[in-house]
Amino acid sequence: MSYWSDPGKHGWDELWQNHPAVRAWINRRVTGDPEKWPIEWLPRVVPDRLPFRRAVSIGCGLGNLERSLVELGVVGRVTGVDASVEAVGQARSAASAAGLTDRISYVAADAWTFLAATRGLDAVLFHSSLHHFDRLADFLGLVRAALSPRGILYLDEYVGPARGEWTWRHLLRWNRLYRGLPAAVRRTRVIRRPINREDPTEAIESSGILPAVERHFRVLARGDYGGNLLAPIYPSLRRPDQAEGPSRAAFDGAVEFLLEREERMLGGDPGSSFHAVVVAEPR
């Protein structure tokens, strides 16, 4: 748990999804609208089940998702669950500052234990948290049991290769593209396997997420948004505000180039996406 005990160490601006062009691209691939985030897809996919009266967000972190759910009218009440006491404390403070404590609550708890004691939920949501869990078939069985028969599973997740599944083919593809970028944009000599050695739960069984979901749930909608190229390459791009960094135009141009390659790759192999948004109901 020590890795997640300091939420401030995980830089928001370092995430590839937060580049404006990338965010618009993801939104368009999932919702069809570059201005609408994936969570805004729910009213279109399951309009007859909203708002969710009782929802739980697993791995809530600092609480951004829960506040958005309330503000969009997707939930009546939502409980955020996270194993990090520090993250839960910050999420509570943010909910209080937004005046949302009557509709958002937080629990510092083990997700397995929490779900095993919970029944009758209208929704269970995961945002970049499910890929930290192992024994996925068992865990998603707990999620299914915690949901009502018409409950909804929502996930926005990394579903690509697990941490031990990277091959030389992945490295070859990434490094060929990386070497083709302007030298001013390249911060490192090569792209290495994207393994977070500080966090042994990162992508622990990620490639098993979709098969485990399909075992316990009926998928109502799925939106793939890649990350096969950008996710491993983006951390090695030199930012415009760094020492000897490229111009903003050069940096954004490199990102746009990678987005074009990403789009082309997904078009040729639609099932290969490393990231997906899934809306499903219990079988």
Model region roles, listed by residue range:
Residues 137-152:
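A short glycine-rich, Lys/Arg-flanked "PGG" loop and its adjoining helix->strand segment in the class I
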Residues 21, 31-52:
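Conserved alpha-helix/loop element of class I SAM-dependent methyltransferases that forms part
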